[in-house]
Design a protein with these regions (language model features):
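Pre-Walker A adenine-sensing motif
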Residues: 11-23
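Phosphate-binding P-loop
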Residues: 20-27, 89-90
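Conserved GTP-binding G-domain of TRAFAC-class P-loop NTPases and closely related GTPase folds
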Residues: 33, 38, 52, 132-201
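Short acidic, low-complexity intrinsically disordered linear motifs used
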Residues: 1-12
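Conserved phosphate-donor/acceptor-positioning beta-strand/loop module used by diverse small-molecule
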Residues: 118-137
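Glycine-rich phosphate-binding loop used to anchor ATP phosphates in small-molecule kinases
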Residues: 77-122
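Conserved substrate/cofactor phosphate-moiety recognition/catalytic segment
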Residues: 41-95
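Short, hydrophobic/glycine-enriched beta-strand segments
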Residues: 28-36, 57-58
Length: 201
C-alpha cells in the first residue's frame, strides 16, 4: 500500500511531463541540451525552478560573465572553469543542471560518469526548435553565438542523441519543442514517443 506522500507523487506525476524534477530533492543531475537560442535559460526559469527550486545551474555563459562583466564578451577558459566548478559541486549531493549546447561530448561524459559514482540519478532534457527560430532568438541574446557554430551544434545534437542514450543510459531522455508552447516527447529504445494525456506512447 502506498504511503500518503507516495500517493500524492504518483497522482501528480501522471500530469507532469518530467516527474523526476519533482521527485528528487537531492542527487538529481539534469543535462540540459540545446542550441544557442533554444531557450535553455527560459526553460529553467519557467519550467524547472517552479517545480523544484533546489537546483543549481551551471553554464559557460554564466562563468564567462563572472570574469568579463560584459555579456557580449567571452572568456576563453569559461568552458573548462565551468566543468571544474560543477565537478566540485556534485560532491555535495545537491541537484544540478548542466546547461550546455552539447558541443563538447567529452565534458558531458565526464560529468555524467562522475555523478553516477556519487549516486546521482541522471536525466537528459534536449530542447529542440527549428534552426531559423534558434538563429533569430540568438540575435536577441546579450551574447550572440556564431551562425557557423549554431549549424555545427545542430548537426551534433541530432547525431549524439543515440550516443548519449546508449552509452550514458540516463534514467530518462526527454525532448521539448520550445518553438512556441512547450511540447514534450521522450526518446526511448531508439524511438521518439509523443506525450498523450498522462503518458508517452
Amino acid at each position: 500500500m502506498l504511503s500518503f506522500s507516495e500517493f500524492i507523487y504518483e497522482e501528480f506525476s501522471k500530469n507532469d511531463p518530467i516527474p523526476e524534477i519533482t521527485k528528487y530533492k537531492s542527487k538529481l543531475g539534469i543535462v540540459l541540451l540545446g542550441l544557442p537560442g533554444a531557450g535553455k535559460s527560459t526553460f529553467i526559469k519557467e519550467f524547472i525552478q517552479p517545480r523544484n527550486s533546489q537546483f543549481k545551474s551551471f553554464s559557460t555563459d554564466d562563468v564567462s560573465l563572472l570574469y568579463t562583466k560584459d555579456p557580449s564578451k567571452y572568456h576563453e577558459k569559461s568552458s573548462v572553469l565551468n566543468i571544474e566548478r560543477l565537478s566540485k559541486f556534485i560532491t555535495t549531493g545537491q541537484n544540478f543542471i548542466y546547461d550546455t549546447t552539447g558541443g563538447h561530448e567529452r565534458n558531458i561524459f565526464r560529468i555524467v560518469n562522475e555523478s553516477r559514482k556519487l549516486g546521482y540519478h541522471i536525466i537528459f532534457i534536449q530542447l529542440i526548435t527549428d534552426l531559423e527560430t534558434a538563429k533569430r532568438r540568438n540575435l536577441q541574446r546579450d551574447r550572440n553565438a556564431d551562425e557557423v557554430y549554431i549549424d555545427f551544434t545542430n548537426s551534433r545534437l541530432s547525431q549524439n542523441m543515440e550516443l548519449y542514450s546508449n552509452f550514458l543510459k540516463p534514467e530518462s531522455y526527454y525532448l521539448v519543442d520550445t518553438t512556441s508552447e512547450y511540447k514534450f516527447f521522450k526518446f526511448q529504445d531508439g524511438e521518439i514517443l509523443k506525450r498523450s494525456f498522462d503518458k508517452y506512447i
